[in-house]
C-alpha cells in the first residue's frame, strides 16, 4: 500500500470511528443557530446508504439499565403505531397499504398474533385510538372506525376529512395527526417540493367538521406531530430542506404557535434567508420563528412522542423522544437513532441526547444501515416501542429495575 493510499485508509478509519463514537447512548448535543455555516459551505451531495440485513445478533444500543428486545418482526415497511387500551398495537405498513394489529396474547412482551385490521388504504401513516374510535390517516383522508376491544378487523371506515383527497403534494406523503386535550384534531401536510411556495403544503391544519383550517405554516415536512400530555401545546418535528450543504438546514423540534410561521421556503432556522427564495419575501423572513431544538441537517426526524409510562426512571416522565430516520444527502451520515429531549417546567431545555443507537456501520463505503427508526409508542407496561422500517422490526425498550446492593 502506498503512502497516499495508507493515509486515505487511515483518514477513512478515523472518520468512521468518529461517526460510530458519536452514536453512543447518553451522548448529548446542543446545536445553536449561531453555529450554522453559510449556505454551500460544503457542496450538496448524494450519499445514499446501503440497507443490509441485520447482522447476526446485532441489536440497538440503549443507555445503561435498559434492555432492548424484539416485540415483532417480519413486517413490511413498519411505520407508525398506536397502543389500544387492551394492549393491542395498531401498526401502519406502507406498501401493503394496511393497518396491522399486533397482539401479545401471552403477556410476555412479544407479539405472537397478528391480524390485518384494515386494508385497501393509500400509503397509510397515522393511527390513534381516541374516545371510542380507531383513527387512521392515509393520502385519501383521515378515517375512523369504532374501537371494539379484542376485535381483529375494522368495521366500516368513516371519512373524517371532507377533502377529495389529502395527496395534495407529490414529494412528502406522510399525513400524521394528533388530538389535543380539548379534542382538537391537527393534521400535517408536507411540501410538494424541496423548496417552493406551492400551497397547500408545509402546513399544519386544524380539522373542524371535516374542513382543513390553516393553523401554522412554514414547516417544510412536519412528520412528527404530538400534543404535550394534558395540554393543548402542539409540538412538531420537521424535516428541513436539502441542497445547501452538509450542515444546512437543521431539522428541528418545536412548539407550534397558532398562526406561527417557521420559515419555509423563505428562510430557515429563524431569520436566515434562503439563498434562492429569501430576497423575494423579506417580510416573511422577518416574521419567521426560531425553533426550540435543532438536529443536524438531514437527520430526518419522524416519530415523536412524550413519555407517559411508569417503567422508565422518574426523570424521563414528560420528556420527548424523536426518531431520526437518517440521511441520504450529506457526506457524513447522520441520524439513524432515537433521541431524548429533556423538558423542564414544561419546556425543552434546548439540546438532545442519544437514547437508542447502533443501527448503522460507518466503517464501510457506502455506509451500511440495517435499521431506520420511525414510529414510537408507549406500550402498556411503560416500555418504549420503536418501529424500524429497514429491519421491519418493532423494538421494545424496557428499563430493568436496579436492586440496591447491600
Residue positions per predicted region:
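Structural WD40 beta-propeller signal
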Residues: 74, 84, 130, 178-180, ...
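Beta-propeller domain segments
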Residues: 22-63, 174, 191-194, 202, ...
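Conserved beta-propeller blade signature
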Residues: 88-92, 133-136, 143, 184-188, ...
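Asp-box/WD-like beta-propeller blade repeats and closely related beta-sheet repeat scaffolds
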Residues: 114, 123, 128-130, 140-180, ...
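Blade-loop segments of beta-propeller domains
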Residues: 78-79, 99-132
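Short loop/turn segments immediately following the C-termini of beta-strands
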Residues: 93-94, 139-141, 147, 190-192, ...
Amino acid at each position: 500500500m502506498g503512502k497516499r493510499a495508507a493515509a486515505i485508509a487511515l483518514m477513512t478509519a478515523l472518520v468512521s470511528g468518529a461517526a460510530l463514537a458519536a452514536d453512543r447512548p447518553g451522548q448529548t448535543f446542543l446545536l445553536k443557530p449561531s453555529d450554522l455555516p453559510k449556505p454551500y459551505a460544503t457542496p450538496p451531495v448524494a450519499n445514499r446508504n446501503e440497507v443490509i440485513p441485520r447482522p447476526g445478533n446485532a441489536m440497538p444500543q440503549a443507555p445503561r439499565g435498559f434492555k432492548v428486545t424484539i416485540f415483532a418482526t417480519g413486517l413490511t415497511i413498519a411505520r407508525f403505531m398506536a397502543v389500544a387500551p387492551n394492549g393491542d398495537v395498531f401498526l401502519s405498513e406502507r406498501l401493503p397499504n394496511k393497518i396491522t394489529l399486533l397482539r401479545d396474547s401471552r403477556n410476555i412482551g412479544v407479539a405472537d398474533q397478528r391480524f390485518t385490521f384494515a386494508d385497501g388504504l393509500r400509503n397509510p401513516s397515522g393511527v390513534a385510538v381516541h374516545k371510542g374510535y380507531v383513527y387512521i390517516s392515509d393520502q385519501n383522508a383521515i378515517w375512523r372506525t369504532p374501537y371494539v376491544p379484542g376485535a381483529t378487523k375494522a368495521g366500516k371506515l368513516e371519512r373524517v376529512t371532507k377533502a377529495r383527497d389529502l395527496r395534495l403534494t407529490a414529494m412528502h406523503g406522510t399525513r400524521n395527526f394528533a388530538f389535543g386535550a380539548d379534542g382538537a384534531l391537527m393534521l400535517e401536510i408536507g411540501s410538494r417540493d424541496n423548496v417552493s411556495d406551492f400551497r397547500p403544503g408545509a402546513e399544519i391544519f386544524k380539522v373542524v367538521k371535516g374542513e382543513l383550517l390553516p393553523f401554522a405554516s412554514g414547516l417544510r415536512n412536519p412528520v412528527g406531530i404530538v400534543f404535550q400530555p394534558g395540554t393543548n401545546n402542539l409540538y412538531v418535528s420537521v424535516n428541513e430542506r436539502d441542497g445547501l450543504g452538509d450542515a444546512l438546514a437543521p431539522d428541528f423540534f418545536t412548539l407550534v404557535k397558532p398562526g406561527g410561521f417557521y420559515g419555509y421556503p423563505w428562510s430557515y432556522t429563524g431569520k436566515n434567508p434562503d439563498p434562492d427564495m429569501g430576497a423575494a419575501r423579506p417580510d416573511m423572513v422577518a416574521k419567521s420563528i426560531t425553533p426550540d431544538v435543532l438536529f443536524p441537517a438531514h437527520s430526518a426526524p419522524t416519530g415523536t412522542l412524550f413519555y407517559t409510562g411508569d417503567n422508565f426512571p422518574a426523570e424521563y416522565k414528560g420528556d420527548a423522544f424523536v426518531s431520526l430516520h437518517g440521511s441520504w444527502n450529506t457526506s457524513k451520515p447522520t441520524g439513524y437513532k432515537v433521541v431524548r429531549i429533556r423538558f423542564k417546567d414544561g419546556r425543552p431545555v434546548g439540546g438532545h441526547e442519544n437514547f437508542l443507537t447502533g443501527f448503522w456501520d460507518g466503517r464501510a463505503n457506502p455506509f451500511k444501515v440495517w435499521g431506520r427508526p420511525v414510529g414510537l409508542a408507549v406500550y402498556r407496561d411503560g416500555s418504549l416501542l420503536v418501529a424500524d422500517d429497514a429491519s421491519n422490526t418493532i423494538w421494545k425498550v424496557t428499563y430493568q429495575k436496579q436492586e440496591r446492593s447491600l
